[in-house]
Each structure stands twice: as structure tokens, then as C-alpha cells.
Amino acid sequence: MAIKAAFFDIDGTLVSFQTHQIPASTIKAIEQAKEQGVKIFISTGRPVAIINNIDAIRHLVDGYITFNGARTFIDDKDITLMPIPENEVRAMIDDASRRDYAVLVCGRDDVALHNHKPIFDEIFVHNLGVNNIDINNPIEPLLSQPVLQLTPFFSEVAEQEIVPLMPHCISARWNPCFTDITVQGADKGNALRQLTKYLGISLDECIAFGDGGNDMSILQTAGIGVAMGNANESVKAVADYVTSSVDDDGIRNAFIHFGIINN
């Protein structure tokens, strides 16, 4: 069955962790796929406000899965919008103050940081290139709007203690230093299901690319799930195909392998 839509994680899939850029081979491959009529979608854990590293292909993008699936949209139309219950947002904010860890609070259009810690700068600013967050922004105005995602900076061990405080939420970790928390049902796989219904295409007509734990649901849901060569082993285990790394033409090579573009 011909592929009609391709879904791409950003960090570690589209964008290299080494160069913080989209490789030229990836840009060219996506341009070629677009010319063949394939719709191009972003599938990221990032909030909309901090998608700041895909300018090279932004003009090619047909729609977005963001906040790990809590908000999915095409143009100005929201396909999914799934906020975290307000009392569970407050529970995490209170816990972060008590245990002294940082939390990025993510609304539909804005983000704010609670309890700034150096680990935030190390990971988000230096490693991920997120340099457009004002750490002095207060979180209270943000808490008056629906919160779609919380990103606490704590270990996997702490996660096992803290996440149960939020019984209606799920955790999707793609970095050892933090995790993304969304409401139950908000994951990339479910977002893909809603998008395909809206577009009138089948899951078998979709290919998805990813490298982190938060990509596993969409790789398992799409007709073809592709893990990058630099992906976690758990991600590779659920993929239909493992391509080369983001820095070694991984997306181009997979497109050629599945006949989406010519060599």
C-alpha cells in the first residue's frame, strides 16, 4: 500500500543531537517525498511554543502532533486538545516545591518554568537548543488556562514515587533527566489514529519515525514504524524497521528502502 503520510519526531530523529540541525539529506528526502504527494507531519513531545529548530522544513509541514499527542492540529484547526486535570497540575507544582525540582508547565500556546534549576539550562538550552523560554515568567497566569503537558526534571527512580500523585496522567520519558507528563490517552499513537480519521486515510498508509520512549506508541500504530539507528534499544524492539542514525542519512535511507523516494 502506498504511503500517504509521514510522521517525524524532532529531537534525535529530524534534528541531530550533535549538530542541532536537520541534515541536508533529510531535508532533500522530505522535499522528494512531498513532491510524490506524501503529507508531512511533525510528531513531537515539544510544546508548540518551543518548536524552534525545524525552520528548514517548516514550509513543507502539513500538520503537527505536539505535547506527545495532547494537541494535534492542521493549520488553525485542533484535531485533539487534551488538558491535564487542574488538581493534578497543582499536585505536581506543590510536589516540585516540596521536593525541590524544576517543572516546565506547558499551556496550549505558552510555557513557563517553575522552580528553575541548572539542569534545565544544561538539557534544554545547551543540549536541545531551546533558547526562547524566559525563566522569569511566572507560572500563575499559565495555570489559568488548560495545561497540556508537564515536564518535571527528576530521575526514573523519583518518577516511580511522584507520577502516582497524578492518577489520570501518563509519563513518556525520552531523556534520563526529565519526562513528559500528559493526560491518559494523550500519546502519539492515539493522536495518529485521530489524524488519520480526520484525513480519511488508513494507518497502513502512514510511516512514522522516532528514537525515544515517547515515540513507541506511534511506531507501533503506524503501518510502518521506523526506529533511528541512534534510538533506544526498547524503541528498536517495537519498530518494523531500524534505519541508520540521524547523522548517517537515516530518514533518506528508510525512504529509499520502502520505495517512497528513488535513490
Feature annotation, model-predicted:
Residues A33, T44, N68, L150, ...:
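Residue-level signal for inorganic ion chemistry
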Residues T19-V38, L81-E88, G129-N131, A186-K197, ...:
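Short, acidic loop-to-helix structural element flanking the phosphoryl-transfer center
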Residues R99-F209, G213-I218, N230:
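Conserved acidic, metal-coordinating active-site core of Asp-based
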Residues G37-F41, L60-D62, V147-L150, D204-E205, ...:
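Short active-site oxyanion
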Residues Q21, S25-I119:
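Active-site phosphate-binding/coordination module
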Residues M1-A5, P23, I181-N263:
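Mg2+-dependent phosphoryl-transfer enzymes with acidic/Ser/Thr/Gly-rich catalytic loops
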Residues K4-T19:
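Asp-based phosphoryl-transfer active-site loop
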Residues I57-L60, N68, L165-H168, T221-A222, ...:
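Short, structured coil segments at secondary-structure junctions
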